[in-house]
Amino acid sequence: MKVVQINTTYGVGSTGRICVEISQMLNAKNIENYILYTQGEGDCTLGIKFAGSIYKKIQALKSRIFGNGGFNSNFATKRLLNELDRIQPDIVHIHNIHGHDCNLSMLFRYLKKKQIKIFWTFHDCWAFTANCPHFMMEKCEQWKIVCEHCPQIRRTSWFFDRSRTLYNRKKKLISGLDLTIITPSQWLADCVKESFLKDYPVRVIYNGIDLNVFKAIRSDFRTQNHITVDKKVILGVAFGWGKRKGLDVFVELSKCLPEQYQIVLVGTDSTVDKQLPNSIISIHRTQNQQELAKIYSAADVFVNPTREEVFGLVNIEALACGTPGITFRSGGSPECYDETCGSVVDCDDIDALEKEIIYVCETRPYTKEACIRKAKEFDKNTRYKEYIELYERINVAGTERG
């Protein structure tokens, strides 16, 4: 069995790390596998790069001008298809392919012609919309019937609204693929069943974390940042702070929480810093997971006021470090918690969120042991083993039904 994964990134970001971790598990079973990617850092010995950053910027500009995202990048896609011809995979596992590096028409026609078994992990909602990875903040449900007059069009196109055309092209191209869809949350699986992809088999495989890295450890974070022992640390972590991730919520919380509550945000940058009051501690983005585990371990409660989230891996990372969480009732984020380790409040209900933060910090209803126990359900070795088992089952049985 030969497996090829296709993703925009290699080793960076959540999807890039997931690809590498799946590849490592395949290597451990002596299964030949490759990762085709366009952006990566560090040792990319497991991967094959098929487009560069300058090329991608040109394709992004073309998409903005002509409003045809997903249908440019002919040269890069030709290189990708040449690699597939060379490798002759039994399985192609698609992750994110909306980074201005892949032409859907060329890729899907090739896969249909070659009758290759496809797994597609949806890390967002882009596959069944015209061109939107998320739609919750807009409260848009056009994707259930047909996308048109897109309320988010300026995010992807400067001049033309081709949402109806893109939606119909995508629907036609995906039809007839030998496809199994994988989602990292039940919420997203439910969305798929309301989309034009409803007749395809869908499997939920939650994302996993490395429990050897994310664990409760002794931390000097408070000392380094001059946080006194009497203060409660309210932690937020995101990589791409903005309204979608709830940056404005933390600004509001800083105004209403008592003085003994210290908000810490991780994953910021100089632009985000300008939007924050001096009372919030800002930690710029880091790829050092050990340092991140120390910060999680130092917090009293992890708060994720996300408004659009497919799953919420940061929730699990915090739990693994013994820190309970609170999240908005949005997307798949609530699926990370149960009554033993965290709580959920309605989206945008700042008053309820403030009260829940104070309740969790003052009464400590969730033990460190319960949080860690919940996190063990998301051990990457267990979760990504499900992918390998699915590959092997499909490879033996042929096309999975239902």
Where are these regions (language model features)?
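Conserved donor-binding/catalytic core segment of Leloir-type glycosyltransferases
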Residues: 182, 227-245, 251-255
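Acidic anion/phosphate-binding donor-loop and adjacent secondary structure
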Residues: 190-193, 209-224, 274-275
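Nucleotide-activated donor-binding/catalytic signature segment of Leloir-type glycosyltransferases, i.e.
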Residues: 267-290
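Short alpha-helical donor nucleotide-sugar binding micro-motif in glycosyltransferases
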Residues: 294-299
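Aromatic "clamp/platform" in nucleotide-sugar-dependent glycosyltransferases that forms part
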Residues: 307
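Short hydrophobic beta-strand element within catalytic cores of glycosyltransferases
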Residues: 324-327
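Conserved acidic donor-binding segment of nucleotide-sugar-dependent glycosyltransferases
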Residues: 339, 343-350, 359-364
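A charged, aromatic-enriched C-terminal amphipathic alpha-helix characteristic of glycosyltransferases
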Residues: 365-395
